Regions:
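Short-chain dehydrogenase/reductase
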Residues: 1-60, 74
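Short C-terminal tail/terminal secondary-structure segment
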Residues: 126, 208-209, 216-234
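Short, small/polar-rich loop/turn modules that mediate ligand/substrate recognition or access, typified
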Residues: 153, 158, 218-221
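Alpha-helical segment proximal to the catalytic Tyr-Lys
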Residues: 106, 150-151
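Substrate-binding pocket helix/loop in short-chain dehydrogenase/reductase
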Residues: 77-78, 85-90
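Active-site helix of classical SDR
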Residues: 101, 137, 145
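Residue(s) in the substrate-gating loop at a strand-loop-helix junction
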Residues: 121
Length: 234
């Protein structure tokens, strides 16, 4: 997503938890002739999120676009979800988005401009077996974003949500392997009306770019990127 952003914007702050990804992304962005401020950040830490926002404004001069994209997933039946796993999901997926919006909105209000995109999931739009805990956080993210969008609608700020289905990233690969099992590919293809097993990262990037380059008439909306899954929803 960060590598696609320079096509539409000049400067970028990229907070992520892994040093290797930070270096690689900064290199890709730099090759396009754009500035990138790479930061390590744990969105569960409210003070760290606030400091990252402050550093962005100091180094870049403004905070025009924020994408709250941090997230984790855990699968299993609800009765098998431990308190620890539940709290990890809530702290990262929901509280992390809350920390991000709460820190970004005052800066954008002062500017009278801002574009915020929050990543939910198709799991935030429907029930899915063995994803109850994860889906609860993603439903919550939508409620958070929609309510906040109403609070800032008169301030030149838009807040929208994207709901991608599964994206081909390391998150869907078995630990310690670069290969994705054939049976998983077949199962995912059967699940989607459009016969693809999953999205590519750039599919999600294009949706984000559409929302952040909007002139200001779209807010509180949910954009589903579901390979046809939206057609099955009531």
């Amino acid at each position: 997503m960060a590598a696609d952003a320079p096509e539409a914007m000049a400067e970028l702050t990229y907070p992520l938890g892994t040093e290797d990804d930070l270096r690689e992304t900064a290199k890709l962005v730099g090759a396009l002739g754009r500035r990138c401020l790479p930061l390590t950040l744990d969105v569960r830490d409210s003070a760290a999120v606030g400091a990252a926002i402050k550093q962005t404004v100091t180094d870049m001069g403004s905070l025009d676009i924020v994408v709250a994209n941090a997230g984790i997933v855990s699968t299993g039946e609800l009765v098998d979800v431990s308190d620890v796993v539940w709290q990890q999901l809530v702290d990262t997926n929901l509280t992390g988005a809350f920390h991000t919006l709460r820190a970004a909105i005052p800066v954008m209000r002062q500017q009278r401009f801002g574009r915020i995109v929050v990543t939910s999931s198709m799991g935030g739009r429907m029930g899915i077996p063995e994803l109850a805990a994860y889906n609860a956080t993603k439903w919550g993210v939508i409620g958070l974003a929609k309510s906040a969008a109403l609070e800032v609608a008169k301030d030149g700020i838009t807040i929208n949500v994207i709901c991608p289905t599964t994206v081909q990233t390391p998150m869907v690969q078995p630990t310690g392997s670069d290969d994705i099992p054939d049976d998983l590919v077949r199962r995912m293809m059967r699940a989607n009306p459009i016969p693809q097993p999953w999205l590519q990262p750039e599919d999600v990037s294009r949706a984000v770019l559409y929302l952040v380059t909007d002139p200001g008439v779209i807010t509180g909306s949910v954009l589903e990127i579901g390979l046809g899954g939206s057609a099955r929803m009531h």
